Amino acid sequence: MNMNTLKRTIALAALALLTGFAALAQRPTAATGASTVHGPEKGSLVIIGGGTVVPEIWDRFIDLAGGRDARIVVITNASGETDDFHNATITELQKRLGADRVTPMNLKNIVEANDPDLIAPITKATGIYFTGGRQWRISEVYLNTLAHQAMWDLLARGGVIAGSSAGASIQGSLLWRGDTAGPDILIGDHTQGLGFMKYTAIDQHILVRNRQHDLRDFINAAPMFIGIGIDESTAIEVHGDTFTVVGKSYVAVHFKGQDDFKFLRAGQKFDLCCRELIKTE
């Protein structure tokens, strides 16, 4: 596909989303009276751009989940048959919290994701972590199910949802790189994320894989959306409509009305509602 065709495809997809997918920004049961524009109304998110998860990111996730009292569910669907992603995550969390505080979950289909007994660990958890891999595998099983609603309930009681790589993109309302054919298709056959970030598309590995410009055309065609690209070993910690950058590299923020993206580094804060850097002394 040449660049002009790609741009037209993105523009048409954006218009379709704006006119036909209002539900992209909503939870499984209709959300009304939202107090935030993009971020979660309650609870917090830790959205990681892939690669090695550095200690300061783990520290923030565990602190937000309750410290030594945290109860974590690790959802491994994105990894498919590959053990590397989820084994390393489970090992790290068990080392920090103990094996009894960490529950792996890999539900096989929508039927299982609607089974109250199988999703019970989410209802008791203080934190959820999505491993990397392919984000459509998460959407295909959990979207608009009782498990999905249980994730919203976790946020409502002040919990935290984290994820790396595919586990980052799934947290947006638009599922970026969600095609089953491969991650080079930006908007594909799975378009809806879990929506913890409303009117948002999230990309990952942006500098390592030279993806920092990929969100631009979509955001220009869909001005109500914001695009967030996160590099490896870097995360954003989201509370309401504010996020803080954590880690060793950069975050790119795309929104309508700017010539290019804004780059943020560790410690910098961004107002998602006003779409501007928060100045700190």
Regions found by a protein language model. Name each.
Residues 1-6:
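N-terminal secretory signal peptides that target proteins for export/translocation
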Residues 11-22:
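Bacterial N-terminal signal peptides
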Residues 26-69, 83-88, 93-97, 175-281:
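C-terminal and late-domain segments of enzyme folds
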Residues 62, 70-120:
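ATP/NTP phosphate-donor binding region
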Residues 121-124, 146-158:
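Catalytic-core regions built around general acid/base machinery
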Residues 129-132, 151-175:
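Catalytic nucleophile loop
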Residues 135-145:
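Glycine/threonine-rich flexible loop motifs
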